[in-house]
Amino acid sequence: MLSYYATHPQSYYRTGIPNPDFPGIARFFRQLAVPAALPIHFTGAGGNIGAGKYNDGSPENRLALAERLADGMRRAWENTRRQPIAAGDVSWTIEPVALPPAKHLAIEKLEALLQRGEPAFAAQGDASKLAWLRRCRAGHKIDIVCLGLGRARILHLPGETFVEYQLAAKAARPDLFVAVAGYGDYAPWYVGTAIAYEQGGYETSPPASNVGPEVEGVLMAAIRKLLQNGK
């Protein structure tokens, strides 16, 4: 029992206590309601959207958000359209892409921080940034993946991808049921659109994104190619 929902999967955080937040609680509610099934939930391309006006950051509101999401999961399940699927209707297509690293990242500076052994190197994400640059220099590519199941397509995208990528994917194949899972390979961190890097904001700022505005052209092309494969 798969479900997909695009939003930042957070209500309140930085408590030092691990928890699945409201999407995990909603998934557990569905497990209780349908014990014979295993609910598996994916967060969609929710890099630049959140619970918005429905979330005031209060601990009490986490349950309310979980109940709303669980209700959406229930209604989606009850309105499932079933179709027979043969082995030939199942596909797994991979499109490796080289996402452009952000220009503000300097490998020499990050290497120097590593050599000095500063505690903040790992705590502030510099270790992840250095690993990303090393991967890029080595020619490592990120796999963009599409699972085909009959008339359904499920895309798996890297990082905290902006919702525009999900909307573009659905618009590219209105004849199919298209679902999107984000938060895959997290090396890029936030993945914005080209214009978003011009507009500013936290998500596309140097502390938050490891890729540049050219990422939109690369990722959109991969999405279109994957969705056009097959019937």
Where are these regions (language model features)?
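Non-catalytic substrate/cofactor recognition surfaces at enzyme active-site rims
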Residues: 1-231
